[in-house]
């Protein structure tokens, strides 16, 4: 099995340390593979290796223009972007979110991933007596190369709910 594929499978199953080893091996074996570096960046974030993650994302971005370096913001700034996006939604979308508690979390937990949440999910909704929509900051940042792109993606994520 291809190392990148193995890393993806481990990552999706919530076996982050196994995924990290496979992704590192894939990058060692094919140092010009932008997808391997991008995957290593995502996995490294999940295991708490922010500096290694940033380095992997920079390497991936240097290999392909289709992957800009993720735009990072503080937790407070991201919360502000979520609030601004919520307030700017069309009336119908705002009404859909009125009874929903919005929660910001850095990433899905390993337990969330093992329970079926995609590790790269932008949001997760838990239904019940009190509906909660969790917005994952890092996964939004990973797909955004600027604050404008981040703002747009957050608004799009909220409007889909």
List the predicted regions and their residue ranges:
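Residue register within tetratricopeptide repeats
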Residues: 17-18, 51
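Canonical positions in the second alpha-helix
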Residues: 25-26, 60
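TPR/TPR-like (Sel1-like) alpha-helical repeat modules
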Residues: 42-69
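Active-site scaffold of zinc-dependent metalloenzymes
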Residues: 119-160
